[in-house]
Amino acid sequence: MEVTVIGAGLAGSEAAWQLAKRGIRVKLYEMRPVKQTPAHHTDKFAELVCSNSLRANTLTNAVGVLKEEMRRLDSVIMKAADSCSVPAGGALAVDRHEFAAKVTQMVTNHPNVTVVREEVTSIPTGPTIIATGPLTSQPLSEQLQALTGEEYLYFYDAAAPIVEKESIDMEKVYIKSRYDKGEAAYINCPMTEEEFERFYDALISAETVPLKEFEKEIYFEGCMPIEVMARRGKKTLLFGPMKPVGLEDPRTGKRPFAVVQLRQDDAAGTLYNIVGFQTHLKWGAQKEVIRFIPGLEQAEIVRYGVMHRNTFINSPKLLKPTYQYKEREDLFFAGQMTGVEGYVESAASGLVAGINAAHYVLGKELVVFPQETAIGSMAHYITSANPKHFQPMNANFGLFAPLDEMIKDKKKKNERYAERALETIQNFLKKL
């Protein structure tokens, strides 16, 4: 039997891989390049459109635990990410072009996968995984709305500008990771209070791209436009993306008033993205505002920040923790449209949907990952949260099943969560 997977983003690619490696034939549909989205630039699978960072790689962070669980489950996304990582302190960042090319190659070359480059405008019959992402095309969105009977929720993800390293005035900046964790991987642009005030005034008065009347302004906190943060007040920036804590200037030994960080975006180290500066400003306005950042006065912007709609379904009402649609047992959903937020989380949901679609086809019992694991905690959250107030969520230890013992020290507590998660996933592998 064959399974149809719609969408070759992180979730769809992972789902197709998990099915194929279990001997299931997969028909993988991807509409790019026949039909592009407002945010994608290539026809590659698993294209990273926001940041090139897959976030923390350490086991004291929930997303670090999630990655390690996925490695143990032979994730194609983690194989590709680990093989084309770039320096990023304690985080896992990748060369986005190499990463997408690697995922495309591995999935396409699998003998059980057939790739079809066309738009899907209706929900197929037979075993299907829908992983069309936050930018699902209008015809399919309408079909999904008809299927679910639920109103869609809208919010906007925003991507940060990328600049050429050669154009940065290195005399005005310094290289350092916060609290000197890992290798010194970030370019830091320090600001005095006066410089910050000038930057802030320019930012809050800059012109944004107008939103359509019918689109509600709901932003996910983890990817909020810098100008929206700024309008909440100066402290939102100073305690957010521009916080100077742990970034003392090695040339003076003093902590700057504010710091703008740049993170390496490609393996060659020629491109850097401005961390936390996802934006919906007009391109001309972006250029003007960036000029107020010390060291970036003459910066060459190779990609301006863009903003796009994000769409997700009301998973607590519609899905089981297997990522299976409650009203149709051979239909699965995966990726950001389920309300998991983040690259790694999306891929992990695809992994679960792929495994369970394989089990469905093979007549095996579907699996619910334990809430003690990062993978299971995400599946539990999106299917058990209050449907009236459901919002997307990143992986975090707050979603894990509580520990049996009381541990006050946060680091030790997180280490215990991680230890328990990896013990649990190791035992759980026997069911797969």
Curated annotation (Swiss-Prot):
Keywords: Cytoplasm, FAD, Flavoprotein, Methyltransferase, NAD, NADP, Transferase, tRNA processing. FAD binds at residues 7-12. It is found in: Cytoplasm. Its EC number is 2.1.1.74. Pfam families: GIDA. One of its GO terms (cellular component) is cytosol. Its cofactor is FAD. The keyword tRNA processing applies. HAMAP family: TrmFO. This is Methylenetetrahydrofolate--tRNA-(uracil-5-)-methyltransferase TrmFO. It comes from Anoxybacillus flavithermus (strain DSM 21510 / WK1).
